Amino acid sequence: MNESVRYAWFGIVAIFLVLIGAASYIQVIGAEDLRTHEANTRELYKQFGGPRGPILVAGEPIAESVPSDSTSFNYQRVYNQPELYSGLTGFYSLNYGQTGLEQRLNEWLSGTSDDLFVERLRQNLTGEENPGASVELTLDPAAQEAAYDLIPEGVQGSVVVTEIDTGRVLAMTSRPSYDTNQLAVHSTTEASENMDALVESGVSPYMNQPTADTAQPGSTFKLIDAIAMLESGEYDTDTVMDVPNSLDLPQADVPITNFGGGACAQRNSAEFTWVFAQSCNTPFSQAAMDMGQEPILDVAERFGFNDDSITIPLSVEASYFPDEELHDATLAQSVLGQVDVQASALQMNMIAAGIANDGTVMNPQLVDSVRGPDMNLLEEPQPEVYSEAISEETASQMTQMMTQTVEAGTAAAAQSSVPIAAKTGTAEIGTEDKVNSWITGFAPIDDPQVAVTLVYRNVDYSVGHRLTVDNIGTIVEAVVEQ
């Protein structure tokens, strides 16, 4: 063989090997990247028109794929009782992709999870469709409906109910809500028009309010303050404190005041439990300036503030207490749940639940179990401890003060057939006569089972206070006594 022929032969072999290698890479190594690439519209249309695992509550589907009459897609994603669950399920849309649990649980629902690999091989051999896995949620349908009914039409609000010793979410809902079916339609034009209408009406279809919408928590943040005070060793439940009606702040023109005309204006001094139950501002602000910022920040972070890693598995917007050094005047306002302090409804629920659970905070959990198409159990999340936030003794002291808040304090109207321990909060939001109204607590007091948090945004003070203190008893009775 002459030299030129030999070189040509080597070149042909090299080209052949390169082609074999490239084909192997595409077929084996790069196949998944190509399949899931955002430009692969064929795969997108295939997935959107295919079956998808259901999301279940008490065994009944709240999201499911049903056969479609469409000539383009074989299946339609359908949401049942969508207003109750839209913030949780999110939507599965050809226009807007996936949100909520549809997005967070996509590998299970679409059947692409590694745990379903053998099932996919079997389906490929038999030619069957991949129906995905089914996901059962922890929600109690009666509790979810009762919680939703506590938010009046036209009011922005959130309700969270969790099981204290496990962290299981029994109810999580909010208003304004919307019909997720409007965004799951096959027509991209119709879906776009529906999205525009939702946004114009003030609905945020990408947000689950109880986990993602943070707001100033007002005096519910005094739960954190009170724990820091008890842990300091300078206070116990009977410590007598000054209760001035006005507290001047260093380098500030506006003093801290107590609620005008309330019980705090009637006494010059009182025991800590009474101060807490009546939610007097000035003693808490003075105590914060005396203790400094660090103890309060430490307690807040033990309960979850400033932690952006919490998932349920929905991602949870981090609640915020400043970790940069604050001047005394700003600290005195911040410990009242004002200024830059922000909290989600779930965060304030974790605080109440942790106190009720002898100081142990559990990771909130929304998924009960995941099962394959053959009903084989694939995953069953177990209760997990988030933190050992406070001692059992401190938790007992906090329970005593929260109980007094309901028996003879700002939450007296929350008394019900099930004994409740709670803390109210009213956050000024800079809009005349409008506030964020909060309550968070647990029940029954002697055998805590559930933690409940309600928040109503941008409401009149009287309306918000009535909604919180009246409704916490309603939801507690609905859950505990059913």
Features from the language model and the residues they span:
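A conserved FAD-binding loop/helix module that cradles the flavin
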Residues: 467
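Extracytoplasmic/periplasmic proteins that interact with beta-lactams or build/remodel peptidoglycan
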Residues: 1-158, 173-214
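Short, gly/Ser/Thr-rich active-site loops of penicillin-recognizing serine hydrolases
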Residues: 378-384, 470-482
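Short beta-strands and strand-coil junctions in structured, solvent-facing domains, enriched
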Residues: 145, 461-462
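Beta-lactam-recognizing serine transpeptidase/beta-lactamase-like catalytic domain environment
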Residues: 170-219, 224-457, 464
